[in-house]
Amino acid sequence: MTAGATLPTAASAALFERARAVTPGGVNSPVRAFNAVGGTPRFIRSARGAWLTDADGNEYVDLICSWGPMLLGHAHPEVQAAVSAAVARGTSYGAPTEPEVELAEEIAARAPVERVRFVSSGTEATMSAIRLARGFTGRDVVVKFAGCYHGHVDSLLASAGSGLATFAVPGTPGVPESSTALTLVLPYNDRAAVEKAFAEHGDRIACLITEAAPGNMGVVPPDADGSGGGFNGFLAETCARHGALFVSDEVMTGFRASRQGQWGLDGAVEGWRPDLMTFGKVMGGGFPAAAFGGRADVMSRLAPEGPVYQAGTLSGNPIATTAGLATLRLATDDVYAHIGAAADTIKTAASDALSRAGVEHVVQAAGTMFSVFLTAGPVRDFADASRTDVAAYAAFFHAMLDQGVYLPPSAYEAWFLSSAHDDRAVQTVLDALPTAARAAAAAQT
């Protein structure tokens, strides 16, 4: 059944009830539960191209793309063929394979990294990068920004302390104070806060980690103005000046914001490089895969070459690396141009529809990924993002869902498209926007 104004949800609702009996909250990642928007989470049965089909047979244009990885759309035939051939050869060997070498070479050809180590999740990548930074520098303090998400690493699930440049407190039950006692949390895009933190703690700071363009509070681009380049360039220079490592988290933006990730939009232009980078999502082609990489002298500190320990049973497994390699080889400049054009069309139409409905909003982007904030802009940090009207977004979300468009079920996430989003898919989104904008207007708080 094609999605329409009133959608059946009985099958999804029944599956959700079964799931809640055996899984906390009925889901394996919290945002999937629809708690932020209400209603019945859709259980997806299949996906192809730009479209999802749920357990009730409803079809949706997918503007989540598995939270970023599906750059080429779902069930891309060439990726499927490569994966099928790899599966036929065996699924995991616990030994080195050629695909992991080829994928590392492909990543190093696009991103400014000299060595790459594979892991199985973005959380593992950031956790390992921080351990390596501490091992390399002999220091213990880590700096991060409020609103930037780096996976569920204990030391990074931190909330800002009771003053600027103070040490953090745990951001969730289950994280002891000792885990965040060496983490500084600063407001994003705030150069003065960064300078103050390094002035007070610079000789103890092992690294500063940031999302290259935050997407987990909605898309909040790094400030592009300022002498010597944008905010990321300023961070790179500040870290270098104080002997700390600059860790750029491109789990979301890597090979998604552009062919070279967010770095291709700022660092490649301004002439700076991170010391370490983390990757995930797109580089796994829809499979569990992530990586961290960087300067050869830093990466050489990893075991077995150096003393900093890191390992993983399924790290670099042949199925995930084959899928990632096939995806990156197919991700040409034309792919990014197509996605960018489709994203621009939707961004413009969303803004027009919301303006006509009288809904205060701002649309922000980092390359091909973007967010619609239902608040006055610009949104420069987590405090700004927190002002978005979540009730209005929930109404907007459900109006789009009822018309066959699957948006992130949270006001604080990025929207993603793929090369499979053709004219029909884009037009479906455009047709749904006016009704959704009016629903948002009616629900404004």
From Swiss-Prot:
This enzyme's EC code(s): 5.4.3.8
Pathway membership: Porphyrin-containing compound metabolism; protoporphyrin-IX biosynthesis; 5-aminolevulinate from L-glutamyl-tRNA(Glu): step 2/2
Modified-residue entries (N6-(pyridoxal phosphate)lysine), positions: K281
GO cellular component: cytoplasm
Keywords: Cytoplasm, Isomerase, Porphyrin biosynthesis, Pyridoxal phosphate
Gene Ontology molecular functions: glutamate-1-semialdehyde 2,1-aminomutase activity; pyridoxal phosphate binding; transaminase activity
Main location: cytoplasm
Keyword Transport: no
Domain of life per record: Bacteria
Protein name in the entry: Glutamate-1-semialdehyde 2,1-aminomutase
Species: Nocardioides sp. (strain ATCC BAA-499 / JS614)
SUBUNIT field: Homodimer.
Cysteines paired by S-S bonds: none
Membrane-traversing stretches: none
